[in-house]
């Protein structure tokens, strides 16, 4: 386990099991780039040990942490969450304000920042259509509501799940049955896939992109493979796209700033570094 005494400020990723993550690669790149003495490690903590580990995070030498499966909901209960974490129902970033352990959800910022960079003015192109009603969808929908998108259609194969999620975000979020996509696509300026369809080992997302307006933006949260069938088809039609790797990189920015006191940039060099690790 890393300690602040030997490495300067430190942060970590808490998960179970401790799967391969690109987060250490990202944060160590920024630490080296800015000459900051510090570190970022992966801590494999089972659910039964999570509360104790988090409550003694600073004792372990950490200024904060990222939290991944299966701990995101429990992290919300053990910390003082901000409005984003509360609305999304999950926390993925922990940090201290004085002696108080606080939490936020940087997936929201990661998603929106990635769109701003990849497709400027994306928020002026009409309705949004979000595919899927799982945990990732909550962060996306909250970000779109926060940005002021007037109408957000939320489609899921089990429409009741979409309805339950939509009810939590107000009248601008409208649940939709999967078989109504053909009617929705012609008025959609932003299409977002939050499902696992198109991920390596999963079937591709079957959707008729020809129905989208020519100025529409297509975003996919999947980043393995980097070029999903959905994004490939969208680019072939001349549509602007935003990939899942961009969201991964941008969501890491806020945590680094909270822990190490400097807001880093998502550079092409960093992107190339992580892309190489994905291959």
Curated annotation (Swiss-Prot):
One Pfam family recorded for the sequence: Shikimate_dh_N
Binding of NADP(+), residues: 83, 132-136, 156-161, 221, 244
CDD domains listed in its UniProt record: NAD_bind_Shikimate_DH
Cellular component annotations (GO), alphabetically ordered: cytosol
UniProt: shikimate binding residues: 21-23, 68, 92, 107, 223
Enzyme type, top EC level: oxidoreductase
Active site: 72 (proton acceptor)
InterPro entries on file: Aminoacid_DH-like_N_sf, NAD(P)-bd_dom_sf, SDH_C, Shikimate_DH, Shikimate_DH-bd_N, Shikimate_DH_fam, Shikm_DH/Glu-tRNA_Rdtase
Catalytic activity reported: shikimate + NADP(+) = 3-dehydroshikimate + NADPH + H(+)
MF terms (GO), sorted A to Z: NADP binding; shikimate 3-dehydrogenase (NADP+) activity
Any one GO BP annotation for this protein: aromatic amino acid family biosynthetic process
EC number: 1.1.1.25
Pathway: Metabolic intermediate biosynthesis; chorismate biosynthesis; chorismate from D-erythrose 4-phosphate and phosphoenolpyruvate: step 4/7
Keywords linked to the UniProt accession: Amino-acid biosynthesis, Aromatic amino acid biosynthesis, NADP, Oxidoreductase
Reported function: Involved in the biosynthesis of the chorismate, which leads to the biosynthesis of aromatic amino acids. Catalyzes the reversible NADPH linked reduction of 3-dehydroshikimate (DHSA) to yield shikimate (SA).
Assembly notes: Homodimer.
Stated family: Belongs to the shikimate dehydrogenase family.
Protein name (database record): Shikimate dehydrogenase (NADP(+))
Protein's organism: Nitrobacter winogradskyi (strain ATCC 25391 / DSM 10237 / CIP 104748 / NCIMB 11846 / Nb-255)
């Amino acid at each position: 386990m890393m300690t602040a005494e030997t490495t300067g400020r430190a942060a970590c990723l808490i998960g179970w099991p401790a799967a391969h993550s690109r987060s250490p690669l990202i944060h160590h790149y920024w630490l080296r780039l800015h000459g900051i003495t510090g570190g970022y490690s992966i801590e494999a903590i089972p659910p039964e040990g999570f509360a104790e580990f988090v409550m003694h995070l600073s004792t372990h030498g950490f200024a904060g942490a990222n939290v991944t499966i299966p701990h995101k909901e429990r992290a919300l209960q053990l910390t003082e969450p901000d409005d984003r974490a509360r609305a999304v129902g999950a926390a993925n970033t922990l940090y201290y304000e004085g002696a108080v352990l606080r939490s936020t959800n940087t997936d929201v910022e990661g998603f929106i920042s990635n769109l701003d960079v990849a497709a400027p003015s994306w928020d002026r192109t009409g309705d949004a259509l979000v595919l899927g009603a799982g945990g990732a969808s909550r962060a996306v929908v909250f970000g779109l509501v926060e940005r002021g998108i007037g109408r957000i259609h939320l489609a899921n194969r089990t429409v009741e799940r979409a309805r339950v999620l939509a009810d939590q975000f107000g009248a601008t979020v409208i649940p939709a049955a999967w078989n109504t996509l053909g009617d929705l696509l012609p008025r959609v300026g932003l299409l977002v896939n939050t499902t696992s369809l198109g991920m390596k080992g999963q079937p591709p997302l079957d959707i008729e992109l020809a129905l989208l307006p020519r100025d529409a933006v297509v975003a996919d949260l999947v980043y393995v493979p980097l070029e999903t069938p959905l994004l490939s088809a969208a680019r072939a039609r001349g549509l602007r796209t935003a990939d899942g790797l961009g969201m991964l990189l941008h969501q890491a920015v806020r945590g680094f700033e909270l822990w190490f006191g400097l807001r880093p940039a998502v550079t092409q060099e960093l992107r190339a570094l992580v892309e190489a690790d994905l291959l």
